[in-house]
Amino acid sequence: VHLEFDKLQVLQSAFITAQTGRVTGVLGRNGCGKSCLFKCIMGGIKPQNIFIRFNDETETDYGHIGKRIRYLPQNVFIPADMTLGEAFRLYGVDYDGLVAFDNKFHTYQRLRSSQLSGGEVRIAEMYMVLNSEAEFCILDEPFSNVAPKHVEMMQNLINEHKATKGIIISDHMYESVMGITDDLFLLRDGYTFPIKSREDLIHHGYILR
């Protein structure tokens, strides 16, 4: 992906891969372009150049891409005036599964997303994305506003679903990301760098030690 705004280089030959059975992590500082990268993939931002391939076949139709990849953006995507039950029906995901995942949601089905905490909405949205029929999922800041107990539950859910999906995840809780990723990239200065160890993150200046 190559993306620039008014000659400001945001992404320069940024490159990531994902495959079924593996979790790919993308780390980077605030403003480095992680969300821009994901939006380019999903068609939310039109870059100067992008190349998307599924199993060696190039894909340019964003309608098809949207069916094959489901995206959890940084911001809430369930409308504030929509109930959780309605959102799950529209997304084609069984609400009872969410209740089985976390029983506190058994009384939330008729509540609007605006009536829930940020962490509760995040859990519900991530559950929807992971349980969709898409082949791949992109999770942008899934652990935002989520309590540590539920972060662990969400990590387990990601590991469960990677058996049938390719999952890309980015979050500032880098240790939580590193704990579940099979492949890891760092986005810096518009480029992606493969990360093999914690020492690589230190080398690139992402962490101090």
Question: What are the residue ranges of the model-derived segments?
Answer:
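Helix-to-loop junction immediately C-terminal to a conserved catalytic motif
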Residues: 42
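ABC ATPase NBD coupling module
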Residues: 46, 57-70, 205
